[in-house]
Amino acid sequence: MLRQLRLTMDISGWIFLPWRRSMSNMKDSPPPPPPLASTFDDVIVDYEDPDYLPLPEYPVRPNEPLETRKQRLLYQSRKRGMLENDLLLSTFAAKHLQNFSAEQTAQYDQLINGVSNDWDIYYWATEVKPTPKEYDTEIMGLLKEHVKNAERVTRLRQPDLNA
């Protein structure tokens, strides 16, 4: 406990050392103004309807070539921000994405980019929660089968990009 307190005091000394040096050069100048009472970090936004949160819509890319879209989706499947979906979606994309038609690719794009919460995708794919009708597509069925892992493939890391 004492060690942690001493470490905290040392760290705070390092943080405030530049401020102390600048203040020692300003002996006759007025003190700095106090910090603003409210910054954007501490503003609490409370909506009347807690189920509704205004989220920006994902931009539709109608003129994107199919190969470019598949490359973008492969990247987005690997970089989800949560390890569970990184592993599930990257292995799914490596297995199926190159064989998708334009319509299937659009469905996959809508699935991974239309949902605002990645945990929803995870819960739907693992069948913890029911899938909403707009996302219950052929692609979601393939993803659910992929998650069941009937082949018993070990998925401890993402597949290589050049494989």
Curated annotation (Swiss-Prot):
Swiss-Prot/TrEMBL keywords: Chaperone, Mitochondrion, Transit peptide
GO CC, alphabetical: mitochondrial matrix; mitochondrion
Source taxon at top rank: Eukaryota
A Pfam family matched in the record: Sdh5
GO process annotations (BP): copper ion homeostasis; mitochondrial electron transport, succinate to ubiquinone; mitochondrial respiratory chain complex II assembly; protein-FAD linkage; tricarboxylic acid cycle
Record's subcellular location: Mitochondrion matrix
Transit peptide: 1-23
Role summary: Plays an essential role in the assembly of succinate dehydrogenase (SDH), an enzyme complex (also referred to as respiratory complex II) that is a component of both the tricarboxylic acid (TCA) cycle and the mitochondrial electron transport chain, and which couples the oxidation of succinate to fumarate with the reduction of ubiquinone (coenzyme Q) to ubiquinol. Required for flavinylation (covalent attachment of FAD) of the flavoprotein subunit of the SDH catalytic dimer.
Oligomer and partners: Interacts with the flavoprotein subunit within the SDH catalytic dimer.
Family of the protein in this entry: Belongs to the SDHAF2 family.
Protein name (Swiss-Prot/TrEMBL): Succinate dehydrogenase assembly factor 2-A, mitochondrial
Species the sequence originates in: Drosophila sechellia (Fruit fly)
